[in-house]
Amino acid sequence: MGDPGSLVTEGRAGERSWCLRRVGMNTEWLLLEDGNEVTVGRGFGVTYQLVSKICPLMISRNHCILKQNAEGQWTIKDNKSLNGVWLNRERLEPLKVYSIHKGDHIQLGVPLENKENAEYEYEVTEEDWERIYPCLSPKSDQMMEKNKGLRTKRKFSLDELEGSGAEGPSNLKSKISKLSCEPGQQVKSHGKGKVASQPSEYLDPKLTSFEPSVKTTGAHVNPGPAKVIELLRKKKKASNPSASQSSLELFKVTMSRILMLKTQMQEKQVAVLNVKKQTKKGSSKKIVKMEQELQDLQSQLCAEQAQQQARVEQLEKTIQEEQQHLEGLEKEEGEEDLKQQLAQALQEYRSLVEELNRSKKNFEAIIQAKDKELEQTKEEKEKVQAQKEEVLSHMNDVLENELQCIICSEYFVEAVTLNCAHSFCSYCINEWMKRKVECPICRKDIKSKTRSLVLDNCISKMVDNLNSEVKERRIVLIRERKGKRLF
């Protein structure tokens, strides 16, 4: 049968998948499977379990959640983590969903005081499955399933130890790794080399998950997350720091003991490998004894790690309580600031209202002046209109009395003046002279007729200022008389 990994690769050959690529590493990539929610943290039950080798409290139990939205876009949410989630160097608000895209930079936790970058930094990418698969980090459930049968400690029999002598040091390394109290990681097989030069290569990687945060003397603790240190400092100023101080002291002591046990176990493993390398059968009892001592050391280390984990959880709980207390203090200070800001805003509001009232009075005075001016203008306009109407009325009287033909009772049309100085319409006097050759007014003989253009022009301009009815009637009259003249 072929390698199961190759079968998985062939089954998804040609596909492209989304993943979080660990910055600067070709391992521990996090696969984002379509349709599945991905959880990341240091606790159990998450999709990918991250155990910080520098600071155990850096990653929260359920640090963040990645899943697809209705449109298939991948999103990330900070699940109220202690040290936060950072997207493109900006911290995300807790419990708020943010979309992520190819090339985005994701950071879990914060850098330590003596580091420029955080321990867990990723880049969102989409790659071919053949490229991603060799670099993927195993899921938590896969690791638990793979190591179900390795939970029980086993002892080597004499025959196994004798047989292992012929197999060489590499086989012994894998057997020693099975003695771990929590064999959650696979031990890589290294070639032959100097055992003393690389003793940590033969340790169970699970034992190295808690890197010491203290020096070998146990007197100085390496800086933890900036947020934790700052919280503890604020707590010292605000209240009694006994709880956090005792937790930190226990943390220091336990880490020192874990470091000492790990050092002893490394030395014991190196000694077993050296003895096994030097002899094949002669020192079997000595090897069994040394491996029994190694088991005892590993058991002690397991117990210390369990205690340390409990203390870490207690310390985290204490820090959270202190953080809540500090938030309460900050809230009270914020309320005082808010009251001051409110009083200042109220004062500004009153000043603004007074200014608006003054402006309102000024505008009312301006409006009253404009209204008065408008009334005056309106009165003057009415006076002018009345005068105009009076002039038009007087002009109508003049037209009716002085510029009307007594024959047709219409305004003169082509006025002519007789030798007696009386004026008539040209058409009317011509018709009159067909019956009598004397003036209709004074009865003098008509000897001459003179056309009066000035009188015609004066009548035409005066008629233009009259109403449309008078204008239309005059136009019709002129047309009728021109038509009669043609006939």
From Swiss-Prot:
Organism: Bos taurus (Bovine)
Gene that specifies this protein: RNF8
Pathway(s) the chain acts in: Protein modification; protein ubiquitination
InterPro entries noted in UniProt: FHA_dom, RNF8, SMAD_FHA_dom_sf, Znf_C3HC4_RING-type, Znf_RING, Znf_RING/FYVE/PHD, Znf_RING_CS
Plastid as UniProt keyword: no
Enzyme Commission identifier(s): 2.3.2.27
Positions of modified residues (Phosphoserine): S157
GO biological process, one term: protein K48-linked ubiquitination
Gene Ontology CC terms, in alphabetical order: chromosome, telomeric region; cytoplasm; cytosol; midbody; nucleus; site of double-strand break; ubiquitin ligase complex
Keyword Hydrolase (UniProt): no
Annotated family: Belongs to the RNF8 family.
Zinc finger (RING-type): 405-443
Pfam families: FHA (PF00498), zf-C3HC4 (PF00097)
Region described as Disordered: spans on this chain: 143-176, 182-201
Protein name as catalogued: E3 ubiquitin-protein ligase RNF8
